[in-house]
A protein has these predicted regions:
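Non-catalytic alpha-helical scaffolds and adjoining flexible linkers that form interface surfaces
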Residues: 5, 18-273
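N-terminal amphipathic/basic-hydrophobic helices that include classical n-h-c signal peptides
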Residues: 1-18
Length: 273
């Protein structure tokens, strides 16, 4: 059955718990679905306790499957799993939240798919996803339910996710002269430090930020998780913060993201960026 998560979605409520007959129950968010032979799917699932796992969903593509909704990208489910060797097999599933506000908007859905791909990239299999799951659930909730610009949700999610996984930039002042409010601030994306426009760091790629964007970045990095989207920033500052986040992400993770390219194709159509 489908039941709605009340308010902001929480990963904490649904830890793994054992059931007799070798199965156990866990909450999980589907980060990726891969079609395999016949009518099966392999799901990449983010769970509170096991981190990122692969789940084989037998018959999930069949029209008769009861679990079609639960086995789609970005479905947040309660799953009953059975483990065999390295693999988990889906025994039962019911959806907790499908994020309809995101699904009904192709642009938001494209952005959410990027959030999922990025989370998968930074969440190593064994790594406890205790912080990752609520972070991603809240981002999906913010995208679908809060009246916030998509660009704000994107910038905040990307910077916070990187910070939570050990890639936080040093944002408390100019790395060269120590000024707390850098003049004509720049972010050195190679070294992950702020500097004044006139102060030189190692000469790698640096991108400009406004003073407001610097304040917003500090807020994003240090605020309580539930307050992540409770800030505002003017359009030009937000564009700079977003661009710097994309560049920092690409440099630190040493890769691009297919879902991000797909999402950005929508933006080009809109405003010819």
């Amino acid at each position: 059955g489908h039941r709605c998560a009340g308010g902001v979605a929480d990963g904490e409520r649904h830890g793994g718990r054992g059931v007799d007959n070798g199965t156990f129950v866990t909450a999980g968010l589907v980060l990726r679905e891969t079609e395999t032979k016949e009518s099966d799917k392999i799901l990449t699932v983010l769970t509170p306790e096991l981190g990122r796992i692969s789940v084989i969903a037998k018959g999930a593509r069949s029209r008769r499957s009861k679990y079609t909704a639960a086995c789609q990208l970005l479905a947040y489910d309660e799953m009953t799993l059975r483990r065999k060797g390295e693999w988990y097999y889906l025994a039962e599933a019911s959806t907790i939240e499908l994020f309809d506000g995101v699904r009904q908007d192709i642009e938001k859905l494209a952005l959410a798919a990027y959030f999922a791909e990025l989370t998968e990239a930074v969440c190593q299999d064994a790594m406890a996803a205790a912080d990752m799951l609520p972070l991603l659930l809240n981002a999906l909730f913010a995208l679908g339910m809060l009246e916030k610009p998509d660009r704000l949700v994107k910038a905040a999610f990307v910077w916070r996710l990187l910070a939570e996984t050990g890639f936080a930039p040093l944002a408390d002042g100019c790395a060269v002269c120590g000024r707390e409010s850098p003049e004509a601030p720049m972010l050195d994306v190679m070294q992950g430090v702020l500097r004044c426009g006139a102060c030189r760091t190692g000469g790698g790629l640096s991108l400009p930020l406004t003073e407001g964007a610097v304040q917003a970045l500090r807020y994003i990095l240090y605020c309580p998780p539930k307050k992540l989207y409770s800030f505002s920033l003017d359009e030009s500052g937000l564009r700079m913060l977003d661009r710097a986040g994309e560049a920092f992400c690409a440099v630190q993770l040493e890769r691009g993201f297919r879902t991000l390219d797909y999402y950005k194709a929508f933006l080009v159509e809109e405003d010819g960026e």
